[in-house]
UniProtKB/Swiss-Prot annotation:
Catalytic activity: IMP + L-aspartate + GTP = N(6)-(1,2-dicarboxyethyl)-AMP + GDP + phosphate + 2 H(+)
Assigned EC number: 6.3.4.4
Known pathway: Purine metabolism; AMP biosynthesis via de novo pathway; AMP from IMP: step 1/2
Pfam families recorded: Adenylsucc_synt
Subunit structure: Homodimer.
Name of this protein: Adenylosuccinate synthetase
Bound cofactor: record note: Binds 1 Mg(2+) ion per subunit.
Annotated substrate binding sites: T298, T299, T300, G301, R302, P303, R304
Annotated keywords: Cytoplasm, GTP-binding, Ligase, Magnesium, Metal-binding, Nucleotide-binding, Purine biosynthesis
Cofactor(s) named in the record: Mg(2+)
Residues at which IMP binds: D13, E14, G15, K16, N38, A39, G40, H41, T128, R142, Q223, T238, R302
GO BP term (any one): 'de novo' AMP biosynthetic process
Species of provenance: Streptococcus equi subsp. zooepidemicus (strain H70)
Length: 430
């Protein structure tokens, strides 16, 4: 029994897809356990970029099983489109498995997402308008439609009619918006269900059987710890649990079967959407990092907010997700800066604090306390070992490890597979 969980430790976009793809080479099963097509994974293979939103990064290994777990909310239309995209690129998807217990995103979820966001005005959360939140709302309210329901024509029709009656009353009376007709959805989405039917199964059985047989299973998180609905910057969060604990709920695998948790972070910080961001940069340094790092959302295309590395955020993520190993990405983006900074603590009303406050009002008053380190001017994109890094870059990497309190297992100096350097094999230490 060998399993590794990959989680983002910041606000998403840390490069989880790349690290998952990298670790997938030694895994036999790769599974997603939460989120939906609001997540964006960019994988570079032979200098070619592939962008995925629903399907696990392991799909590029035809000999490995890729799983969409029960904790994922699935937009059938997006999934069918993504499958077609992969097929056009010559990628087989015969190794994909989809949980019959996963909940389905339907057009009324997307419409409600948009109407709710518009109604918030200046207090908007910054949702991707993908229907993720409303789908999880229906799940919690026990009125959601699952993949198993989508495949049964009669059950799908019955539940869709019931849900539309309720949602349309909401659209018309609360939002003064046009209703959605049953005929606009039913045949189209039932058709999508039939297209994905061959992939649908009880994925909990597949995952547990694999673990019991001693196979290596990799769990792939979406978004990041700071977007977790319980442990993140609530309410500026996603509607699921990206933390490692979400694996057990979202995949049907017990906590005793989790061996390692790899936390993925960038050498700086970024986030998309609204919400607190203590180390955010508004100057030319921030603009430089954004452009060199290509900091634009995979899903939304929106410019990401960027800032210095925040070890307070990282220690919070380490604690609530039980991180055992760190994967540090995008060190190359900081090349050319005379000075680099790391936030080591916050100043809250004149008092130094080392933890991340739950209160948004307190966070607004938090000022980062920085430790400054000398930068480096060398091009490090071809570096293949820690020793080959310039001394200042090497010191920066080591200082991050010290402040976070987790050993760094890999560091990357670019988007390519060959630009990921191993300091310690995650699989070998299990």
């Amino acid at each position: 029994m060998t399993s590794v969980v990959v989680v983002g430790t910041q606000w998403g976009d840390e490069g989880k897809g790349k690290i998952t793809d990298f670790l997938s080479s030694d895994a036999e099963v790769i599974a997603r356990y939460q989120g939906g097509d609001n997540a964006g994974h960019t994988i570079v293979i032979d200098n070619k970029k592939f962008k995925l939103h629903l399907i696990p990064s392991g799909i590029f290994f035809p000999e490995k099983i890729s799983v969409i777990g029960n904790g994922v909310v699935v937009n059938p239309k997006s999934l069918v489109k993504e499958l077609a995209y992969l097929h056009e690129e010559g990628v087989t998807t015969d190794n994909l498995r989809i949980s019959d217990r996963a909940h389905v995103i339907l057009p009324y979820h997307i419409k409600l997402d948009q109407l709710q966001e518009e109604a918030k005005g200046d207090n908007k959360i910054g949702t991707t308008i993908k229907g993720i939140g409303p789908a999880y709302m229906d799940k919690a309210a026990r009125v959601g439609i699952r993949i198993a329901d989508l495949l049964d024509r009669d059950i799908f029709a019955e539940r869709l009619k019931t849900n539309l009656a309720e949602k349309n009353r909401l659209f018309e009376k609360m939002y003064d918006s046009a209703p959605i007709a049953f005929d606009e959805i039913f045949e189209e989405y039932y058709g999508y269900g039939q297209e994905i039917k061959k992939y649908v199964t009880d994925t909990s059985v597949i995952l547990n059987d694999a673990l019991d047989a001693g196979k290596r299973v990799l769990f792939e998180g979406a978004q990041g710890v700071m977007l977790d609905i319980d442990q993140g910057t609530y309410p500026f969060v996603t509607s699921s649990n990206p933390v490692a604990g979400g694996v057990t709920i979202g995949s049907g695998v017990g906590p005793s079967k989790i061996n390692k948790v790899v936390g993925v972070c960038k050498a700086y910080t970024s986030r998309v959407g609204d919400g607190p961001f203590p180390t955010e940069l508004f100057d030319e340094v921030g603009e430089r990092i954004r452009e060199i790092g290509h900091e634009y959302g995979t899903t939304t295309g929106r410019p990401r907010r960027v800032g210095w590395f925040d070890s307070v955020v990282m220690r919070h993520s380490r604690r609530v997700s039980g991180i055992t190993n760190l994967s540090l990405n995008s060190i190359d983006v900081l090349s050319g800066l005379e000075t680099v900074k790391i936030c080591v603590a916050y100043d809250l009303d004149g008092k130094r604090i080392d933890h991340y406050p739950a209160s948004l009002e307190q966070l607004k008053r938090c000022k980062p306390i920085y430790e400054e380190l000398p930068g480096w001017s060398e091009d490090i994109t071809g570096v293949r070992s820690l020793e080959d890094l310039p001394e200042n870059a090497r010191n920066y990497v080591r200082r991050i490890g010290e402040l976070v309190g987790v050993r760094i297992s890999t560091f990357s100096v670019g988007p390519g597979r060959e630009q990921t350097n191993i300091l310690e094999s995650v699989w070998a230490t299990i």
